[in-house]
Regions:
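Short loop/turn segments that flank or connect secondary-structure elements
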Residues: 1-203
Length: 203
């Protein structure tokens, strides 16, 4: 039985099918208090209208209209008020879709010292892997993450240095690390470099 401090992350195969959809925060405020820069796109007018312009800065390297919101001296989001998000129903897409379960899924940890709260939350997640399919899918995602880290120099410009982006990329290219046999069995394999490169560029 899982320890009381552990959090159920859900069935692994079910979670994979939900990556990218809105993530309910519940009582978790780890992201809100972990020195995060939050990207907000020009197609989020509802969110932008609720954040004071003085808190927004031009997003470096992105087209005009993309902005980021920083954090205060405590590392808290400026919209985090009285222990909760003051614009929760109108929060940025980045906040809606950020799912820290991607880290344990890929066997990675966040790469920023100021994110101790997120790291603690990550260590609490426990996925259910009740069927062989769940086990092999999780193994494929972790194999993809390990491969990307080990072969980043062989894939110049394609492997993110940021562990969050790397984890999501590993989820996205997991299929190339799977082989389906005539017997119906699915197993994890190490693909050719060109196959990995092609999988990344198709995204």
């Amino acid at each position: 039985m899982a320890e009381p401090d552990h959090l159920p992350a859900g069935r692994f195969s079910t979670w994979l099918g939900q990556v990218g959809v809105d993530v309910p925060c519940g009582t978790c405020t780890a992201c809100c208090t972990s020195s995060q820069f939050v990207h907000i796109g020009p197609d989020e007018p509802d969110t932008l209208s609720r954040i004071p312009k003085a808190l927004l800065f031009v997003a470096p390297g992105l087209p005009r209209g993309h902005v980021v919101m920083g954090y205060d001296e405590r590392g808290h989001c400026p919209m985090f008020v009285d222990g909760a998000c003051s614009i929760y129903e109108h929060r940025p897409r980045t906040c809606r879709t950020y799912d820290c379960r991607v880290f344990p899924a890929a066997g990675l940890e966040p790469d920023h010292d100021g994110r101790a709260g997120i790291a603690a939350q990550i260590r609490r997640w426990r996925f259910d892997v009740p069927e062989p399919d769940d086990e092999v899918l999780q193994a494929a995602v972790r194999a993809a993450a390990s491969y990307l880290r080990a072969n980043a120099k062989l894939l110049p410009g394609l492997v993110p240095g940021n562990s969050t982006q790397l984890a999501f990329l590993a989820v996205g290219i997991r299929e190339v690390f799977l082989e389906r046999l005539a017997s119906g069995e699915v197993r994890v394999v190490t693909p050719a470099l060109d196959a990995v490169r092609a999988a990344i560029t198709r995204r």
